[in-house]
Design a protein with these regions (language model features):
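PP2C/PPM-type serine/threonine phosphatase catalytic domain
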Residues: 1-228
Length: 228
């Protein structure tokens, strides 16, 4: 099932019909993006699968903010820019950290230079020989689960709700109903943008990696996501 990617596969503000499936970095990657069922405006999300040989690559999701066209433009800028940097850094022994961080910083400068007031979140995972490392800005999240559904890693959303959960002041199950769940504290497109880098994690054969925007994580509990 699926094809083997040899060059970047990018989805920039478009709705994907069905789930796109690819052989990617010694595993199988499934991609889908679409606007919310009750939303009349265009899809502001973007995603990319950027391979580097058969054993490595980077997965990225960006969620545009600020309303159309600026949100859609911002997420597309971010995914295109990091994709360019990753492709340029790809070699027999890839080291993605510098390319990812430089790509995010360059995307931040380019989004601010548009002058539209738009911004975007971003969540990225580098994969090299079944070892991953997460990077994120904003409230798009990264989740790693084990064979029996145990949560092995979950990023902290850069938002009032995310910080409240981490501090123990809000139960994760109550976050979906919190009135501040749509607020985000850190974005590409701001002078104070910062990138959070997670730990290196070696994936077991049946581990699952999920990268999604708040459209996923604001509507389903982590426990529900891992069941899917």
């Amino acid at each position: 099932m699926g094809i083997t990617l040899t060059e970047p596969e990018l989805y920039l503000g478009e709705d994907v019909t069905g789930i796109a499936t690819f052989h990617f970095a010694q595993g199988v990657a499934c991609a889908w993006t679409g606007r919310a069922p009750d939303k009349e405006s265009d899809n502001e999300d973007a995603l990319g699968l950027i391979p580097c040989g058969s054993n490595a690559g980077v997965l990225v999701v960006a969620d545009g903010l600020g309303g159309l066209p600026s949100g859609k433009q911002a997420s597309s800028i971010a995914v295109r820019q990091v994709s360019r940097n990753i492709v340029a850094s790809c070699n027999e022994h890839p080291v993605f950290r510098e390319a990812i961080l430089d790509g995010i910083e360059q995307a931040n400068q380019r989004v601010m230079a548009t002058g539209t007031g738009g911004g975007t979140t971003i969540a990225m995972v580098e994969i090299v020989n079944r070892t991953i490392r997460p990077y994120h800005v904003g409230d798009s999240e990264i989740l790693v689960t084990g064979q029996r559904g145990r949560i092995k890693h979950q990023t902290i959303s850069h938002s009032p709700v995310g910080y409240a959960i981490e501090a123990g002041r809000l139960e994760a199950g109550d976050a979906i109903h919190d009135e501040e769940r749509h607020l985000v504290s850190n974005i590409i497109g701001a002078t104070d943008m910062r990138v959070e880098i997670g730990p290196r994690i070696t994936l077991a054969p049946l581990d699952t990696l999920v990268i999604g925007s708040d459209g996923l994580f604001d509507n389903l509990h982590a426990g529900e996501i891992k069941e899917i």
